[in-house]
């Protein structure tokens, strides 16, 4: 069914990934002599968990649920890249282009708000070896880059920035005052994240696949001013496999 702009605007539908019927339990054959691409990869997060330090020192830190406070613009979409067949029969997806990042803010139970850049930039994800077809038992696992939430020209409330602004907003800070130095000296950090894509539905005729994903990455660190939080993101995904 074709929807118009008026049908979609203000409903949140634009943030949802396409889905496949529950009966889509087929297989998409892979020919090692051919090359393939993954197109229209869409990642729709449904749960954001943040690792919280326990109040009791005898307990271990654990991921706790949060509340999303960002508007309906959290999904990654139109991601594409090469799907390579390796010598051991495994498949490797290399992300090349697409809407591969979204700034997101979540709120913890105590009221603290955690900004993060939900992303899969430069994702390289591989399957298990000896894959002759993509089925509901196929899993992709890999790493991606997590850029800084802020860019070089961002100025904080005191006018400090990486490429512009004041060098310091403190009159005469102590030489060994590390906390003040971290706030003054801005840094563009690039960290790593991990993701697993678990295929649950396959349309062997069209090459469409769908399933669930779980991603782990770090939150924003305010350009080095404080320690980032560990964030776990869970959701659903959709993609299309096609010959290159």
Swiss-Prot record:
> What task does this protein carry out?
One of the extrinsic, lumenal subunits of photosystem II (PSII), which stabilize and protect the oxygen-evolving complex. PSII is a light-driven water plastoquinone oxidoreductase, using light energy to abstract electrons from H(2)O, generating a proton gradient subsequently used for ATP formation. Required for dimerization of PSII and for binding of PsbQ to PSII.
Query: Native species of this protein?
Result: Thermostichus vulcanus (Synechococcus vulcanus)
Protein name, UniProt field: Photosystem II extrinsic protein O
Q: Which GO terms describe its molecular function?
A: oxygen evolving activity
Q: Name one GO cellular component term.
A: photosystem II oxygen evolving complex
Complex and partners = PSII is composed of 1 copy each of membrane proteins PsbA, PsbB, PsbC, PsbD, PsbE, PsbF, PsbH, PsbI, PsbJ, PsbK, PsbL, PsbM, PsbT, PsbX, PsbY, PsbZ, Psb30/Ycf12, peripheral proteins PsbO, CyanoQ (PsbQ), PsbU, PsbV and a large number of cofactors. It forms dimeric complexes.
What remark does the entry make about the cofactor?
PSII binds multiple chlorophylls, carotenoids and specific lipids.
Which protein family is named in the record? Belongs to the PsbO family.
């Amino acid at each position: 069914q074709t929807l118009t702009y008026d049908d979609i605007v203000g409903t949140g539908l634009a943030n949802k990934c396409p889905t496949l019927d529950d009966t889509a339990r087929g297989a998409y054959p892979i020919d090692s002599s051919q090359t393939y691409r993954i197109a229209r990869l869409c990642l729709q997060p449904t749960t954001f968990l943040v690792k919280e330090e326990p109040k009791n020192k005898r307990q271990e830190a654990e991921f706790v649920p949060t509340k999303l406070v960002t508007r309906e613009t959290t999904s990654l979409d139109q991601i594409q890249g090469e799907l390579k067949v390796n010598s051991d029969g495994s498949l490797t997806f290399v992300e090349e282009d697409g809407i591969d990042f979204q700034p997101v803010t979540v709120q913890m139970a105590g009221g603290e708000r955690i900004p993060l850049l939900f992303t899969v930039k430069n994702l390289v994800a591989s399957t298990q070896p000896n894959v002759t077809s993509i089925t509901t038992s196929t899993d992709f696992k890999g790493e991606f880059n997590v850029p800084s939430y802020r860019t070089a020209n961002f100025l904080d409330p005191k006018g400090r920035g990486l490429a512009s602004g004041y060098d310091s907003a403190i009159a005469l800070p102590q030489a060994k005052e590390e906390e003040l130095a971290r706030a003054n000296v801005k840094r563009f950090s690039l960290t790593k994240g991990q993701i697993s894509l678990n295929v649950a539905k396959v349309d062997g005729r069209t090459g469409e696949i769908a399933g669930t994903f779980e991603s782990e990455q770090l939150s924003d660190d305010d350009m080095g001013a404080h320690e980032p939080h560990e964030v776990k993101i869970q959701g659903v995904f959709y993609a299309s496999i096609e010959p290159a």
